[in-house]
Amino acid sequence: MLKNEELLRFFKTAYCFTDSQRNTAYENWISENVKDKIVIDLGAGSGILCYLAVKYGAKKVYALERRGRLIHRMKEILGDTVEYIHADLLETELPECDIYLHEWLTSEFWNEKRFLRNFYEEGDKELEVGHILDLVEYAKKNNFIDKLYPNTVELSSIEGESITEYEDIKLYSHGKYSRQFIEEHYSDLTLNSIYKNRVDSKEVIWKGHIKDLKYMRVNNYLGWILSFDNEYEVSNHLPISHWGLRHGAG
């Protein structure tokens, strides 16, 4: 358990690579779409999405990450199979790519900074994060909004509850290469903090392409689903997820 806790402290928000629903959605889509393509992960964290892109035959893979220690760890795992960009997304000129992968770290769709305060003290550079709409605006400005994935969004007003628990990672439930990544490089990591989500009522308030996303507020919890052309969903209100309804409407 001590080793498990040390790894979670090291990764802080990047431990989402142990979430099987997240890994399965990304791996399924990557397996069908990256062969012979140039791919960048915008916030590579553990490096698992870059690992998947390499395994499924991407022509070139870039890992963009602002945290130096995570770049160092990725290099230990991925070596020279990817090119590393140690920089902040919104302050960086990106290479031309066919696919731009992104992921939202937190249950708080509009306010990632509020979530990150659980991990970092005020004034820490890690709190200098952009809003999801900043990413959308940046992608439009730099002409890759139609290459940004996941690319479809559903927002909803939800009444329900999320309970946090530690649960076995259940390697058997992960995709082939996601499972291999964890087995080969994080075999000591056996437990993950997850949300068990209960949805009592749900009203969809918006659904569309991420390029048309605008700020919306609800009186209850804000439920969200991100998907790849309406397939392979990740969500903060699936029955079990590392995202939850815990952080309010915002």
Give a label for each model feature.
Residues D36:
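Phosphate-coordination loops involved in phosphoryl transfer and adenosine-cofactor binding
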